[in-house]
């Protein structure tokens, strides 16, 4: 039986740089292939070639789909063949309804007039295929990210898709939403729809894939049956070396208490009757990594936003630093107290995409380069930028390159570099490795370990429980705004953390002082 897709010896160059070099990929109808590789490995370039974003003639090699050679000059050409790609940044118009988004560019018309009755019937069938039950008149912007992802798939199904490409589809989804999405992909597989799945979450890759294809530095490293590969095997192929331990296990000593929060309560910014954080208290020691775990809506991000002075609603409670009560109502006051934060959404809150990498790094510490006068010392700033880029191993062709052009991992390193310029005593990391590759994760984990060895106290919030457990000395477990447990991390398991989150009573393990 012929393959549904064959990409043969694809090479794509940008100037003198080969982004992909003689890469081949093939898959059958109904097969799920995961495409793995670090950021910058060439995965996205290969998919852009496949989808016609890079048109025929701009690359070398051959693409055969359903027995015919594709020579696409535009993405619409491949869509007509039955190839659809869903990017991590969803391509939905949030002001339009769900129905309007699904049929956008593919409207059903009769004598030049849109036939809403036929579109509604088709809409109901499409949503049933992705297990959604939403009014066609619902505005897409009112949906959660998980539902928006499924609307994108329904939109692809409306184009008679035969090959669905999913690029980091679960980066912003909860575990429950991820589980629903994977079930739908498996169901589509039963109907003969093939899938190329791109993700840094190797547990998902293992769970969903028939085969796994690894690309490194633009070259095809290998394609193997998923059943015969461990996560360590995938990592070794991706990075070209064996990572003996993803989470550094170097000993570090905790010191005296540096932070204490007492009876913190935060209200919803609009509805004062809803408590997003409900009377929680905890402490943090110098050189300690404190993890905060919990399901979506637990109040984790709200808690640290209060600490950093950026929670948009009202809150009350007491914050003590070095035993002295402090008042923090904005980020400037937090920074003055030695607190720095890497935000949850780096694209929205962490970077200025069109600004240079270097300027993003020094953005919060410009006073370091003024020397008491209003004019910047450009030489001192440039020296600091180059040192920060080297220290954090930020991969950029130039400090003057717009930071929006860097990979997610390198953007995150630049944000960390900015935080370290503030000489923080307390560093808050909210989803520090979301959407970044395994190699960049490893480097960030090593950096965190180095910081606590210097006595910096670190708070880590992550939706990935293995990350929380792999990094933290102690774990706070939150659920629906309440602190449910304060657990010393002596080989804690994910099951113990989830049990603590969902049990009715509050549980605290006493710490040795």
From Swiss-Prot:
Enzyme class (EC, first level): translocase
Full protein name: Xylose import ATP-binding protein XylG
CDD domains: ABC_Carb_Monos_I, ABC_Carb_Monos_II
Annotated SMART domains: AAA
Quaternary structure note: The complex is composed of two ATP-binding proteins (XylG), two transmembrane proteins (XylH) and a solute-binding protein (XylF).
Source taxon at top rank: Bacteria
UniProt source species: Shigella flexneri serotype 5b (strain 8401)
Upper classification of the organism: Bacteria, Pseudomonadati, Pseudomonadota, Gammaproteobacteria, Enterobacterales
Binding site for ATP: 37-44
